[in-house]
């Protein structure tokens, strides 16, 4: 002690020398120092201690007495508020305590912890110091409490000093004072593992053996029995439970009884003791519904469990979650308890489920106890049992990452392809826990790495959510797809950018993850948007370097493309609406024309019937006059005529045969009969009989309305009707004049004219045949697609004058003039306005005759034919065999003409008196059409051409716009290729140069608008053989609306390109903006939907500049 003191205080100040002298017991030096300076007797060191305190600590009684004689302060306190008496009581130094108490030391002084010297004296086994203090203390001062509200009796019980307890109780210390935790001295006495604590407990209980003292609960509800059981002190438990007032099943604040504590700590003897002394006979449960057996089972105390199971009052009840003690044992891996319970309780159900349908195997797998799992599988536990979440034990093991348990379960037959109620597979749970080894095991057992749950999330997305990069590496190496989107449109990259896992983002982009997937929400966020919202600056920079786009940038790009597509859509829609409107108008016009034709036909039919009645009256008058002339003739002439009639019958037969043969050869252009007239050769009886037959046939003919008009295809147009009307009018006037001349010549003709009848008719037939052929060829050259009307015409005059060659043979010059007129009409004729196909005009050739005269001649010929059939059976037989009978050509032609004109509405109504003349056939000139009607036709044609020109122009603009859009798309692909292939700059330059050369070679920079040349000017010199129009390449719209009316749109020849290959500069992407890639620069804007009006000036074509 002296050596240490010398070392401590060597080289120190004078005060330190005083303290050193006190410690060393150097009384002479101490007195010398005090004599030199009286203040040194109470000098404090760095701890606030005086030389007197050091004398107590060093047990230097002589020095202490010297200091006290020198006037040292006995109650001086140090920094911890302790005096020399505190130090003497703490050391249990009886002499110093007696010395200090004699010098009036304060025994009630409290230190910083509120302890008095009385509290400190309880630490020692000897009660002498305690007894010395109790002699100086008043009766009420013995229960002084420290800062923890503990008295000297608390400390005596804590230190297990039964003598101190007895001494304090003798001095009236209160045994029921609780401390700051609510504990009384009996709690501290019972909370001791030493068996000798039984004496302290007995001392306290002997002082007051009350029930309230035995069952006193601290602030946590624990009784002295709880503490005794917790320390495993069987003797103290035995003492406490020996009192009848002790409650063995008292609850603490956790609803645990002393029996729960004994089971939890595995005190089998205490358990047995408590079970035996339980007066209620029931096993209480804690706040979770667990019995003491649950506690013993989870702690793997097989002996304690055996004690419980063997006691008759114990049952394996379930807790509040429906778990039995067997499940608790499985969850804690208590294999010994499980074996004990399976051996002792044969009726135990190993697959019993709890409230959530979990089994003991679920609990063991969740906790990762491999041995327990093996034990349960050996005892036939169900390996794929499902709980309410549809989780098997494998799910629980994958969630917690217990690799060995997973392997054990898979070997035991667990299925890896099951999913829970959310669609999560075991791989999902392994990825959520970041267990890379478990993921590898599951993938090796053939689980799909891209399996999706009901929300569309993959295991890769689950791993990305937690940023488990090791787990992501395993999944990606096993072909996990990083671009799969869940139902909300999010990918694994969305989760990584949201949480700012830069290393995982680098890994994912290295496996070709697309950086611009948009979610399906209203905001349509991309991974870059999530990084921006989270303010992860490093992630933002990295994503931008790898081509990531925000939703705002994507919307700008999409808006540009949508606008381009929408413009095209508007053009197509407007075009379709215009087309539908035109078609609707065309249909309405056709319906109106058809209705008008129907009304005209009905009106003309009524007028025809009225005309036929007038014609029949005139016919009777003519027959009456003829009968009077025949009666005045002599009987000799009658016999001669009969003889001549018999001689001419073979000629009639032959003529009919010739006519039939001509018809069979396929040229039925006119219905002819070469037989001579029958009126002058018959008797009065035959004439009367023929008159009756003709009357009947005429009525039938009027009812049946036969027609020789042949319809090929289509319908007759309104313009054709107008031409036909004027042709009929002109032809009627000319025929009227010629009819008078033929009538004069016919009256002067004798029997010699009758002998020339055959030759004249043959000549006329040949002339008409030639004329019909020319008309048919001229019709073919016109390319008429509508209705071609061929009218049976006869050039012979009516009555006996039909034999004249002048009436039948038409001069060649006149026929040539007629052909030229037809050609002129055909070529100058345009399709009607509103027609859907150009060149669809219908050409109609009309030949008219006097309807009244033709009808009379037809009735006479029919009657004569009936008489001929009776007189000549051979003729009738041959005629019936061929299916056609010889008819009077003039009558047939005139009647057919009149019926055709009435049916088609092409001949105007005329009075019966104006149509009594029959003349040779003549074509109608277009000059005969009134000027007003011609102007209407021309105006309609102009309107139709203008409409077609607009359609053609719209189609051209749409095609040009589409081609320019394709060029812009190729250019954008080249620009994006540059950003993606920075390392291959030369290859990109080559592709760019090739693209520019292609544009300069194939596309024309200086465009002029296409103008169609009118066909009316270009077709004046077209001949018959070259009238067919060659079809050109048409656009889709031209194919829909047909070719142009002229048949061909003449396009100006494309000038040779002014650009040369040497002029093309291999420029970078920044110079591409100076290249004019659009065909229709400045022209597409002239359309109705574009930016400027069509009257704006045309933009000049741009050239490539170096």
UniProtKB/Swiss-Prot annotation:
Q: Name one GO molecular function term.
A: calmodulin binding
Q: Which Pfam families match?
A: Ank (PF00023), Ank_2 (PF12796), Ank_4 (PF13637), Ank_5 (PF13857), IQ (PF00612)
Q: Which GO terms describe its cellular component?
A: cilium; cytoplasm; cytoskeleton
Residue spans of biased composition, Basic residues class: 812-822
Q: Where in the cell is it found?
A: Cytoplasm; Cytoplasm, Cytoskeleton
Question: What is this protein for, i.e. what is its function?
Answer: Required for normal renal development and establishment of left-right axis. Probably acts as a molecular switch between different Wnt signaling pathways. Inhibits the canonical Wnt pathway by targeting cytoplasmic disheveled for degradation by the ubiquitin-proteasome. This suggests that it is required in renal development to oppose the repression of terminal differentiation of tubular epithelial cells by Wnt signaling.
- Record-given protein name: Inversin
List the source organism. Answer: Gallus gallus (Chicken)
């Amino acid at each position: 002690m002296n050596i240490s003191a010398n070392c401590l205080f060597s080289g120190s100040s004078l005060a330190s020398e005083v303290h050193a002298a006190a410690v060393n017991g150097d009384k002479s030096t101490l007195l010398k120092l005090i004599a030199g300076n009286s203040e040194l007797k109470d000098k404090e060191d760095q701890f606030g201690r005086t030389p007197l305190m050091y004398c107590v600590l060093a047990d230097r009684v002589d020095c202490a007495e010297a200091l006290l004689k020198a006037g040292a302060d006995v109650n001086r306190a140090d920094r911890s508020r302790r005096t020399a008496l505190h130090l003497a009581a703490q050391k249990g130094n009886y002499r110093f305590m007696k010395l200090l108490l004699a010098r009036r030391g304060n025994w009630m002084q409290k230190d910083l912890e509120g302890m008095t010297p009385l509290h400190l004296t309880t630490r020692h086994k000897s009660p002498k110091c305690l007894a010395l203090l109790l002699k100086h203390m008043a009766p009420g001062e013995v229960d002084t409490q420290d800062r923890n509200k503990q008295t000297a009796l608390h400390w005596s019980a804590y230190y297990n000093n039964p003598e101190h307890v007895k001494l304090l109780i003798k001095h009236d210390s209160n045994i029921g004072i609780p401390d700051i935790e609510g504990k009384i001295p009996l709690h501290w006495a019972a909370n001791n593992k030493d068996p000798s604590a039984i004496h302290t407990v007995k001392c306290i209980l002997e002082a007051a053996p009350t029930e309230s003292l035995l069952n006193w609960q601290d602030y946590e509800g624990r009784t002295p029995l709880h503490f005794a059981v917790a320390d495993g002190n069987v003797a103290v438990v035995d003492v406490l439970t020996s009192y009848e007032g002790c409650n063995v099943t008292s609850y603490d604040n956790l609803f645990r009884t002393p029996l729960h504590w004994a089971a939890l700590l595995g005190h089998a003897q205490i358990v047995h003791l408590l079970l035996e002394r339980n007066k209620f006979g029931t096993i209480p449960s804690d706040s979770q519904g667990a019995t003491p057996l649950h506690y013993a089972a989870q702690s793997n105390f097989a002996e304690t469990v055996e004690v419980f199971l063997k006691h008759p009052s114990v049952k394996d009840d379930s807790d509040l979650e429906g778990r039995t003690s067997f499940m608790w044992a499985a969850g804690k891996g208590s294999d010994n308890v499980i074996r004990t319970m399976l051996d002792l309780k044969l009726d135990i159900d190993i697959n019993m489920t709890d409230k959530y349908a979990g089994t003991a195997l679920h609990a063991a797998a969740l906790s990762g106890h491999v041995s327990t799992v093996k034990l349960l599988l050996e005892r036939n536990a169900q390996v794929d049992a499902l709980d309410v979440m549809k989780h098997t034990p494998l799910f629980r093991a994958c969630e917690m990452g217990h690799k060995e348990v997973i392997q054990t379960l898979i070997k035991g037959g667990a299925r890896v392809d099951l999913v829970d109620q959310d669609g999560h597979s075991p791989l999902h749970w392994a990825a959520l826990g970041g267990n890379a080894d478990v993921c590898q095991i599951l993938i090796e057992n053939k689980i799909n790495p891209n399996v999706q749950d009901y929300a569309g999330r993959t295991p890769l997305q689950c791993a990305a959510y937690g940023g488990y990069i090791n787990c992501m590496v395993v999944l990606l190496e096993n072909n996990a797809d990083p671009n799969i989107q869940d139902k909300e449109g999010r990918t694994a990259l969305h989760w990584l950018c949201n949480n700012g896992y830069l290393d995982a983002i680098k890994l994912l982009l290295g496996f070709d993850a697309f950086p611009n997937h948009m979610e399906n929400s209203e905001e349509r966020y991309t991974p870059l948007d999530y990084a921006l919202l989270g303010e992860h600056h490093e992630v933002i920079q990295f994503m931008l370097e790898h081509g990531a786009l925000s939703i705002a940038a994507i919307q700008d790009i999409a808006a540009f493309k949508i606008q381009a597509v929408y413009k095209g859509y508007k053009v197509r829609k407007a075009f379709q609406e215009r087309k539908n409107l035109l078609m609707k108008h065309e249909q309405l016009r056709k319906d109106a024309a058809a209705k008008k034709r129907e009304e005209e036909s009905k009106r003309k039919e009524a007028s025809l019937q009225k005309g036929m009645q007038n014609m029949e009256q005139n016919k009777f008058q003519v027959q009456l006059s003829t009968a009077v002339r025949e009666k005045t003739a002599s009987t000799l002439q009658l016999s001669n005529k009969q003889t001549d009639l018999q001689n001419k019958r073979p000629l009639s037969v032959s003529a009919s045969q010739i006519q039939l043969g001509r018809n069979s050869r396929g040229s039925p252009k006119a219905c002819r009969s070469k037989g001579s007239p029958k009126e002058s050769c018959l008797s009065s009886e035959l004439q009367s009989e023929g008159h009756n037959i003709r009357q009947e046939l005429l009525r039938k003919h009027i009812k049946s309305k036969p027609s020789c008009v042949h319809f090929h295809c289509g319908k007759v147009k309104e313009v054709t009707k107008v031409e036909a009307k004027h042709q009929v009018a002109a032809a009627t006037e000319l025929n009227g004049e010629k009819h008078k001349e033929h009538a004069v010549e016919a009256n002067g003709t004798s029997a010699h004219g009758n002998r020339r009848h055959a030759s004249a008719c043959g000549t006329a037939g040949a002339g008409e045949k030639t004329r019909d052929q020319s008309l048919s060829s001229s019709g073919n050259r016109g390319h008429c697609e509508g209705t071609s009307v061929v009218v049976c015409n006869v050039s012979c005059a009516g009555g006996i004058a039909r034999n004249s060659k002048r009436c039948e043979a038409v001069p060649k010059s006149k026929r040539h003039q007629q052909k030229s007129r037809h050609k002129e009409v055909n070529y100058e004729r345009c399709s009607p306005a509103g027609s859907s196909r150009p060149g669809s005009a219908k050409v109609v050739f009309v030949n008219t005759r006097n309807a009244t005269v033709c009808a009379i001649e037809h009735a006479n010929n029919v009657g004569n034919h009936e008489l001929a059939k009776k007189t000549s059976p051979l003729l009738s037989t041959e005629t019936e065999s061929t299916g056609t009978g010889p008819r009077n050509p003039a009558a047939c032609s005139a009647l057919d003409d009149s019926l055709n004109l009435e049916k088609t509405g092409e001949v105007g109504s005329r009075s019966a008196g104006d149509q009594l003349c029959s003349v040779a056939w003549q074509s109608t000139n277009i000059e005969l059409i009134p000027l007003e009607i011609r102007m209407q036709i021309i105006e309609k044609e102009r309107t139709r051409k203008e409409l077609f020109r607009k359609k053609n122009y719209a189609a051209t603009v749409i095609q040009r716009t589409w081609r320019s859009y394709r060029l812009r798309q190729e250019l954008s692909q080249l620009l994006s290729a540059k950003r993606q292939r920075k390392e291959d700059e030369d290859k990109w330059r080559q592709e760019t140069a090739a693209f520019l050369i292609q544009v300069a070679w194939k596309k024309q920079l200086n465009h002029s608008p296409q103008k169609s040349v009118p066909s009316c000017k270009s077709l004046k010199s077209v001949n018959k053989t070259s009238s067919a129009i060659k079809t050109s390449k048409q656009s889709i719209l031209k194919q829909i609306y047909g070719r142009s009316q002229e048949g061909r749109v003449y396009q100006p020849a494309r000038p040779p390109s002014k650009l040369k290959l040497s002029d093309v500069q291999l420029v970078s992407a920044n110079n591409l903006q100076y290249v004019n890639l659009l065909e229709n620069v400045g022209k597409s804007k002239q359309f109705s939907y574009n930016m400027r009006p069509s009257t704006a000036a045309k933009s000049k074509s741009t050239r490539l500049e170096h």
